[in-house]
UniProtKB/Swiss-Prot annotation:
The complex is composed of two ATP-binding proteins (PstB), two transmembrane proteins (PstC and PstA) and a solute-binding protein (PstS). It is a peripheral membrane protein. Its EC number is 7.3.2.1. It is an enzyme of class 7 (translocase). One of its GO terms (biological process) is phosphate ion transmembrane transport. The keyword Membrane applies. Belongs to the ABC transporter superfamily. Phosphate importer (TC 3.A.1.7) family. It comes from Natronomonas pharaonis (strain ATCC 35678 / DSM 2160 / CIP 103997 / JCM 8858 / NBRC 14720 / NCIMB 2260 / Gabara). The keyword Membrane applies. PANTHER family: ABC TRANSPORTER I FAMILY MEMBER 17. The gene is pstB1. The lineage of its organism: Archaea, Methanobacteriati, Methanobacteriota, Stenosarchaea group, Halobacteria. Keywords: ATP-binding, Cell membrane, Membrane, Nucleotide-binding, Phosphate transport, Translocase, Transport. Its main location: membrane. This is Phosphate import ATP-binding protein PstB 1. NCBIfam families: 3a0107s01c2.
Amino acid sequence: MSSDDTTDPTADDESFTDSPVAGLEQSTTTRGSGRTVISARNINVWYNETQALSDITMDIPEQEVTALIGPSGCGKSTFLRCINRMNDRIDACRIEGELELHGKNVYDEDVDPVALRRKVGMVFQKPNPFPKSIYDNVAYGLKIQGYDGDIDARVEEALRGAALWDEVNDQLDESGLELSGGQQQRLCIARAIAPDPEVVLMDEPTSALDPVAASKVEDLIDELVEDYTVVIVTHNMQQAARISDKTAVFLTGGELVEFDDTASVFENPSSERVENYITGKFG
C-alpha cells in the first residue's frame, strides 16, 4: 500500500507503459504463501526534530523477498531497523504507529526486544564476524540463548544454509576474520539464521563485496526465501529487479510512494517521481 502523494502515485499514466529498465533481468519466480508476516500501519519516525519516516503503511508477505529502494537518506534503513527494534538503541529516535509480526505489535510493552531479534535476524552492510572461530561465530547465539539441541548439527545446518559449509568444514576452528569478504558475509548470514528466525533483514548486504561475491549472496537469498521471509535494503536497481518479489520505493522525506510487485514497479511505475528515480534521473 502506498502512502499519500501529491502526484497520486496510484494513478495510471499511459506515458509509463514502456519499461524504464528495458532489458533488465527480473525475477520471474512465484513463491510465498500469500500470507502477511509483517504489517506496518502509519509508522512515523523522528530523530530529534527531524522526521525520517512519514506515515508508512505496508504489508510484507511471508517467504518472499521484499526490496526497499530509494535515494540515500530516504528512510529505508530506518524502516528496516524498526522491524526488529534496532532503533531502540538510538536515544534520539522516536517512533509512532504500529508494526506487527503475525498480528502482534512488536512495540507493545510486553515484547522483549531480545526475543524479537531471535525471530527477526539481521545482516549488515559490511561483514562483521566476531573475532572468534568460524564455529563459534555460528554457535555463539545458540549458546547464549540456551539452545538445548545439537549445536554441532545446527552449526552445520546454518553453514549449509549459507552455502558456506563445503568451503569451511575442515577449518571450523580457524578465525572467521581470516575468510574472504564474501565468505565473511555468508558467515554472518549463517550466524543470523542459526537461531532459525522467521524473518531475515539485510541492509545492503552486497554493497561492500566484489561482483563475484555479491552474485553468490544473491543466489543464496534466492535459496533462503524457501524457509525465511527476506527484507533487503539495496541501492542497486538491477539487484532489486533480479532477486525481489515485491519492491517498496521510498523517496526524500521518508515517504513510501510505491509498493507493488517488482515487475510492476520497474515496468510500469505509478508516478513520474518513481520513474525518475528508477531510471536514474535523480537519486
